[in-house]
Amino acid sequence: MAAVAAASAELLIIGWYIFRVLLQVFLECCIYWVGFAFRNPPGTQPIARSEVFRYSLQKLAYTVSRTGRQVLGERRQRAPN
């Protein structure tokens, strides 16, 4: 059972790193497409990527770490504000 828990936690960590790499590549190459949903209307300030995605990445990191703690049997923590 411990081997299954360790493998699950390892897969979560690997998945998290793959997600981060894909997100970074997406932001670097695709955020300036004309039809991109997060693009600001003409004449407005450009989007600060750190502001747009910071909260969602924090929540995702919390969810991944919480799932890992649950798999390993550690106690839970509160989500970041």
From Swiss-Prot:
Keywords: Developmental protein. One of its GO terms (cellular component) is cytoplasm. The keyword GTP-binding does not apply. The keyword Transmembrane helix does not apply. One of its GO terms (biological process) is brain development. PANTHER family: NEURONATIN. May participate in the maintenance of segment identity in the hindbrain and pituitary development, and maturation or maintenance of the overall structure of the nervous system. May function as a regulatory subunit of ion channels. This is Neuronatin. It comes from Homo sapiens.
